[in-house]
């Protein structure tokens, strides 16, 4: 990954990007940063800007209105899968004490074939995405069996100290369960949101999500494995079970761990019981009436060149125009944008909007087929309130009463369960054009996104 960017809460941040690539355009998105009243700085080609052309330079300017951990990455198709990403640390209060900040810990899948070539292959194949060839922790990993080279990321800790570790899933396709052998995590943030601390031996981290955890060095002096494992239904990786890093106590006789994993039950769903540290409440009245629904589905058709795979919302795969970003329409007062922009207007400021996101059967060669896949849904420009999730089809009469309006989970990436639903809410308090999309890079490049404008 690229260098980690550091700032303090409230700072004005300026970052200059130069595109030194010979062919591709690019643009940098500051993941999770709300860009409050600075939509032009969101860094999304075709939405808030034109791609930055080879040889050109652009300076992004925005304020750190949140604090915690995040990452920046290219938003030019699946380009970030080649490593065009890095961590962001914005210093601010913490909900639990610690002695040492170990910084960001990026966890990612890795492919030996260039991601643009893979993306084109996936878009024209009914076989689904390929397995990752390996995983990387902070950009490093030992090569799989039968290959040579590489190394584990290593960390040295001192007995009796407490360490803050900033976990970020920067993958293209893989979600992970993560753990440090013999050491519990005290979890203190969920994305950019400080939470009431809770303890876990393993945590699930979907693509784009972040968790800050505190590790207490209270075990026998030695070396211990940190593990990142892909679960069934959460993507596939050819080196699964061997994606690790090493934590070694000062004074340990060996830097090679012999520790064993804590048993756990695998899953591909979000952490539960997350309670934001500062209370927020969502009005419950509007959801008693009509509910806006966004249906997520795959479509596989065939043309003269073979299969064509798209993912869409409400039967439409987004198709943006890099030559004319949607923000240009908005600034010009022109609402004659193409329907393929998948733009939903939210005309009223300071209004609460409620959305049911539902995975529905797709269309494969003209036939309805259920291809149930979990989707990490990411919203730009806002933290959303996650009122509930479930499997099957959402029914407001049955599921509505169980939705949580009293200080619900708040974040910017949440997992839509495979074949299931999620209900989220946010207030229109940040003018602009904001993308909401699946953060599986193959899916968003195949169209799984909408825009909110208001």
Swiss-Prot record:
Subcellular location: Secreted
EC numbers on record: 1.10.3.2
GO molecular function term, any single one: copper ion binding
InterPro entries, sorted: Cu-oxidase-like_N, Cu-oxidase_2nd, Cu-oxidase_C, Cu-oxidase_fam, Cu_oxidase_CS, Cu_oxidase_Cu_BS, Cupredoxin
CC per GO annotation: extracellular region
Chain positions recorded as Cu cation 1 binding sites: 29, 378
Keywords from the named record: Copper, Glycoprotein, Lignin degradation, Metal-binding, Oxidoreductase, Repeat, Secreted
Cofactor: how bound: Binds 4 Cu cations per monomer.
Organism: Botryotinia fuckeliana (Noble rot fungus)
Residues annotated as domain Plastocyanin-like: 1-95, 101-252, 319-454
Gene Ontology BP annotations: lignin catabolic process
Principal location listed in the UniProt entry: secreted
PROSITE patterns registered for this protein in UniProt: MULTICOPPER_OXIDASE1, MULTICOPPER_OXIDASE2
Glycosylation sites: 24, 138, 169, 218, 314, 334, 395
Keyword Repeat: yes
Family: Belongs to the multicopper oxidase family.
Obligatory cofactor(s): Cu cation
Record's protein name: Laccase-3
